[in-house]
């Protein structure tokens, strides 16, 4: 794309590689080698380039403005490693220093400048992974995600977070050991506070320097791919930090944000909302998403805070109805549809995931049918119901059994991911282990039951770091995980970690748990009405008709001779039991194999009887089918 076309399409919202035009680029002019700098600031009164190469304010370089509101200057003064900023004179005379919105490198805090650094093109070695990803897709593949905050998974002795060079050496082998299929990172784009959650971004192309360099993250992704692990990143296209040195009121007027003050300001999060209806903003944001896919070979993008982009009244501040008289953010709907259209045309094998907390329909619906076009939506309703149920005293669970079964009413209205995310283990909500009912032993039993239910329930899976070994304390973004839990004398945390690893492998090994995740063809409810005993049972199936019988005892009462109906007569073997001693339970071995009996049980003609462990989950597989 030539420069004229790049400028034109940026203004029409159709430049999806805007970083190739904006920012700084090495070039040659009149036989002189140097750099050209470009920035969009349509309403600035004047604009200069300053940096190490100008003595900062000593000799600022005047930039020229074109008819599209883009300022540019060519200079041979900068050197590799120099820091630069834009000196923006706003209408009215105020002068502010701004970072480059398209910078890939930002200087280390407390500095706020952008860095001139050329990143050599990487010779990737993950072609086999990318080829399989394109060939296999993900809907009929196992997806089990380990959610990570890069700054607090592990830390150095001085309290600094691991770099991605260190994470490559330690996190990648851990993901392999724990049998996860994907890792998802909370925001890695530059944000004002390194030790934070990271959801108020300042650099949408820049890598957060707290975690190392872009090259280190490229190497990390490659290492993941070479070990058959996909990488997903969180991305926040709805709002951005209101820090004055970043995007906020860039040229002195609403530039990236809405013109209307109330729409521009996000009162709940103390941030600014992108004007999603502005063409230049669409070019900027879609270019950002595409850059992370192309440059880092990532396998998925989780779009944060989608609800805030869809509803004018989602925030706590004042709002005005749209032209149709309702609360829908029409620009937000259009932008998300366009985002998914563009990205899926270029990368149909990259997952687009929505973190959306309302009852809005068609989040994963087809765009041509009015849907937003995401591949998956986090099932926040399921998560809230399930955690409320597992926190409850078992005596009362029969009165709230609908919390466990309600999801079967809307299972396939969207393509869901079942998340136990960072949001559920902070702000006094307690860790997942601490949420569980009972003493320490029963809490671990409940956790094993919970994770098995998540694995067996239709939908892809996500678990936040630390939960895999039952960390007791809440997550703190400025503290490393409690790895010392694994050294507890009773060994329950270590056994919990091993349980999670084996459960994840069990999931990968059984197609019935993931091949038909978006259809009732993959699910058959045996009994969702046994509220008095608080036992839930259902069957998962694959395309060949193989099946697993999944039974969950939600109370601490062992049930001998427990009987359910099954659709196939045969010899059944127990292939999973959460109460085995090796997992921290009390059972020394599995149930013995069981032959079905010919009895009428509801609509079934065959029954299966076995001992159901207290507060346990038991999964059965047909070892040999019997003739009718």
Swiss-Prot record:
Its domain of life reads Bacteria
Specify the signal sequence span. Answer: none
Task: List the GO molecular function terms.
Answer: 1,4-alpha-glucan branching enzyme activity; cation binding; hydrolase activity, hydrolyzing O-glycosyl compounds
Q: Which InterPro entries match?
A: A-amylase/branching_C, Branching_enzy, GlgB, GlgB_N_E_set_prok, Glyco_hydro_13_cat_dom, Glyco_hydro_13_N, Glyco_hydro_b, Glycoside_hydrolase_SF
One annotated Gene Ontology cellular component of this protein:
cytosol
Gene3D superfamilies according to UniProt: Glycosidases, Golgi alpha-mannosidase II, Immunoglobulins
| UniProt keyword Glycosyltransferase present | yes
Q: What is its EC number?
A: 2.4.1.18
Q: In which pathway does it act?
A: Glycan biosynthesis; glycogen biosynthesis
GO biological process assignments: glycogen biosynthetic process
User: What is the reaction catalyzed?
Assistant: Transfers a segment of a (1->4)-alpha-D-glucan chain to a primary hydroxy group in a similar glucan chain
Q: Which UniProt keywords apply?
A: Carbohydrate metabolism, Glycogen biosynthesis, Glycogen metabolism, Glycosyltransferase, Transferase
Catalytic site: 304 (nucleophile), 355 (proton donor)
- Described function: Catalyzes the formation of the alpha-1,6-glucosidic linkages in glycogen by scission of a 1,4-alpha-linked oligosaccharide from growing alpha-1,4-glucan chains and the subsequent attachment of the oligosaccharide to the alpha-1,6 position.
Assembly, per entry: Monomer.
Which PANTHER family has this protein been placed in?
A: 1,4-ALPHA-GLUCAN-BRANCHING ENZYME
What family, per the record? Belongs to the glycosyl hydrolase 13 family. GlgB subfamily.
The molecule here is called: 1,4-alpha-glucan branching enzyme GlgB
Q: Which organism is it from?
A: Streptococcus mutans serotype c (strain ATCC 700610 / UA159)
């Amino acid at each position: 794309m030539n420069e004229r076309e790049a400028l034109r399409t940026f203004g029409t919202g159709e430049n999806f590689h805007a970083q190739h035009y904006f920012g700084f680029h090495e070039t040659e002019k009149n036989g002189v080698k140097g750099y050209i700098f470009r920035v969009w600031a349509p309403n600035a009164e004047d604009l200069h380039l300053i940096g190490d190469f100008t003595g900062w304010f000593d000799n600022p370089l005047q930039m020229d403005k074109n008819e599209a509101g883009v300022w540019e200057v060519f200079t041979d003064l900068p050197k590799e490693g120099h820091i630069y900023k834009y000196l923006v004179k706003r209408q009215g005379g105020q002068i502010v220093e701004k970072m480059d919105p398209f910078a890939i490198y930002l200087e280390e805090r407390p500095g706020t400048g952008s860095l001139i650094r050329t990143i050599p093109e990487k010779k990737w070695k993950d072609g086999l992974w990318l080829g399989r990803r394109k060939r296999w897709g993900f809907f009929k593949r196992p997806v089990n995600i380990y959610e990570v905050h890069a700054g607090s998974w592990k830390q150095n002795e001085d309290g600094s977070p691991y770099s991605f060079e260190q994470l490559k050496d330690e996190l990648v082998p851990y993901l392999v050991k724990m049998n996860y299929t994907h890792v998802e990172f909370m925001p890695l784009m530059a944000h004002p506070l390194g030790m934070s959650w990271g959801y108020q971004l300042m650099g949408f192309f820049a890598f957060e320097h707290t975690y190392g360099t872009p090259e280190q993250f490229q190497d990390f992704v490659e290492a993941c791919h070479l070990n058959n692990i996909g990488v997903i990143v969180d991305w926040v296209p709805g709002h951005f930090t209101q820090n004055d040195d970043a995007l906020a009121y860039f040229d002195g007027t609403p530039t990236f944000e809405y013109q209307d003050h109330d729409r521009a300001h996000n009162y709940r999060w103390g941030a600014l909302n992108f004007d999603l209806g502005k063409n230049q903003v669409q070019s900027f944001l879609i270019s950002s998403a595409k850059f992370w896919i192309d440059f880092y070979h990532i396998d998925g993008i989780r779009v944060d805070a989608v609800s805030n982009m869809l509803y004018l009244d989602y925030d706590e501040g004042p709002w005005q109805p749209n032209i149709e008289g309702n609360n829908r953010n029409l620009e937000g709907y259009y932008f998300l549809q366009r985002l998914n259209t563009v990205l899926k045309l270029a990368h149909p094998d990259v997952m687009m995931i929505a973190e959306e907390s309302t009852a809005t329909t068609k989040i994963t619906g087809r765009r041509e049918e009015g849907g937003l076009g995401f591949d998956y939506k986090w099932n926040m309703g399921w998560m809230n119901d399930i955690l409320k149920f597992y926190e409850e005293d078992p005596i009362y669970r029969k009165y709230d059994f609908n919390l466990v079964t309600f999801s079967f009413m809307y299972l396939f209205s969207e393509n869901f991911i079942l998340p136990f995310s960072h949001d559920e283990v902070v702000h006094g909500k307690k860790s997942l282990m601490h949420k569980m009912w009972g003493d320490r032993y029963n809490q671990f039993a409940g956790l094993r039951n919970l994770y098995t239910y998540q694995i067996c329930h239709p939908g892809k899976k996500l678990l936040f770091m630390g939960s895999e070994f039952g960390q007791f304390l809440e997550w703190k973004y400025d503290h490393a995980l409690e790895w010392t839990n694994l050294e507890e004398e009773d060994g329950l945390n270590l056994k919990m970690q091993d349980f999670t690893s084996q459960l994840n492998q069990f999931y990968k090994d059984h197609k019935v748990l993931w091949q038909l995740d978006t259809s009732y063809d993959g699910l058959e409810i045996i009994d969702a009405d046994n509220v008095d005993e608080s036992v839930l049972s259902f069957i998962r199936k694959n395309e060949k008709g193989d099946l697993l019988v999944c039974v969950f005892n939600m109370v601490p009462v062992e049930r001998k001779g427990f009987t359910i109906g099954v659709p196939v007569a045969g010899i059944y073997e127990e292939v999973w039991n959460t109460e085995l001693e090796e997992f921290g339970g009390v059972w020394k071995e599995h149930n013995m194999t069981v032959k079905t009996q010919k009895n009428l049980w509801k609509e079934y003609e065959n029954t299966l009887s076995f001992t159901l462990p207290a507060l346990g989950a038991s999964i059965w597989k047909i070892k040999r089918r019997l003739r009718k």
